[in-house]
Amino acid sequence: MPMLNAQQFLNQFSLEAPLDESLYPIIRDICQEVKVHGDKALKMYNLTFDHTKTDHLEISHEQIKAAFDTLDEKTKQALQQSYERIKAYQESIKQTNQQLEESVECYEIYHPLESVGIYVPGGKASYPSTVLMTATLAQVAGVENIVVVTPPQPNGVSQEVLAACYITQVNQVFQVGGAQSIAALTYGTETIPKVDKIVGPGNQFVAYAKKYLFGQVGIDQIAGPTEIALIIDDTADLDAIVYDVFAQAEHDELARTYVIGEDAQVLKDLESRIAKALPNVDRYDIVSKSIANQHYLIHASNFDEACHVMNTIAPEHASIQTVNPQPYIEKVKYVGALFIGHYSPEVIGDYVAGPSHVLPTNRTARFTNGLSVNDFLTRNTVIHLSKDTFEQIADSAQHIAHVEALYNHQQSILIRQS
């Protein structure tokens, strides 16, 4: 990829729609089939799409516990440390009900959702971290029923995924994936309970099903390909940056990587190191396609221009690896998560840092946020007025109702004034 100056990049920068519209009829048919035929449809789709025969959709509590008990100690400790850090961070940011003075007449109270479905991807890799980064949040929120769905595998669901479900006290785990699992969580089947909200990343079928069913069920987001944008200078460890780029690229051929810098020579040096390391990289087929088609080097003329490019991209992950990263914290506004300094690589945020790795993609960071414990709470506004307060504001209320020609609204006020 040739180096672009900031203006050249901004002139050509665009993101394709994250979803393939041609999938719509397929998604609609899958959802309808699950709505009508329930578990029978799910087993059929497991065979058709995942080439796995599943006599029992639910994985028993005994199997989940056995997965944890038999897990090697190092993996168990790593998952446990991740869980503890996520739990501590989410507890620190959880919205709580405040003890209020009697004179407070308008306030908010929070309640946990009753039931949540979590989609845990399968296929190209196993993702116990997704369980930790979603189910822990629901647990901290106080969600009563946490349900995980994950695609069936010929050799069974990943033991690491099941162990993470045990650690986070997930209530039920079902081996079903794709759009059909989202439909099952939305409508309910003979085996899978209907939930109030569905969270977790997935492929285009999962994303489109969430979009299609939103309104009948709550969702976290419609995720596109993963992405990272880095701002670097001559103090950055370029060999480390190479693997920050590769780490993102290995997720998906469509993963997008951007490197921004004010020093053109640093960017050229980085690109030569990427080219040198690429032939021997793990997961070469995926990484090489991502680098060939979705990798950008952007030369910014100054600090403000670098920040402007970053805010325009509005990436899922932003990494600042410069001699003085502090000023970027205020200036870089629209990102899913902001990783500051050499010892805060994006990858540590994928696993153990604390905040959830479920983050907005495809420029949606310009108007939405990463998943947090507060996404598993409802917020109710309470209005409890005294007679004195009512009398102070009633005339304004009834007059606005009159202006809007909503006379029953007006009468609701007037009858209380008489």
Curated annotation (Swiss-Prot):
EC number: 1.1.1.23
Enzyme class name: oxidoreductase
Co-factor remark: Binds 1 zinc ion per subunit.
Gene Ontology annotations for the cellular component aspect, listed alphabetically: cytosol
Binding positions for Zn(2+) per the UniProt entry: Q248, H251, D350, H409
Residues at which NAD(+) binds: Y119, Q180, N203
Keyword NAD appears in the UniProt entry: yes
GO terms for MF: histidinol dehydrogenase activity; NAD binding; zinc ion binding
Biological-process GO terms, alphabetical: L-histidine biosynthetic process
Pathway(s) per entry: Amino-acid biosynthesis; L-histidine biosynthesis; L-histidine from 5-phospho-alpha-D-ribose 1-diphosphate: step 9/9
Active site, per annotation: E316, H317
PANTHER family: HISTIDINE BIOSYNTHESIS TRIFUNCTIONAL PROTEIN, HISTIDINOL DEHYDROGENASE HDH
NCBIfam families noted in UniProt: hisD, PRK13770.1
Family: Belongs to the histidinol dehydrogenase family.
Protein name: Histidinol dehydrogenase
Source organism: Staphylococcus aureus (strain MSSA476)
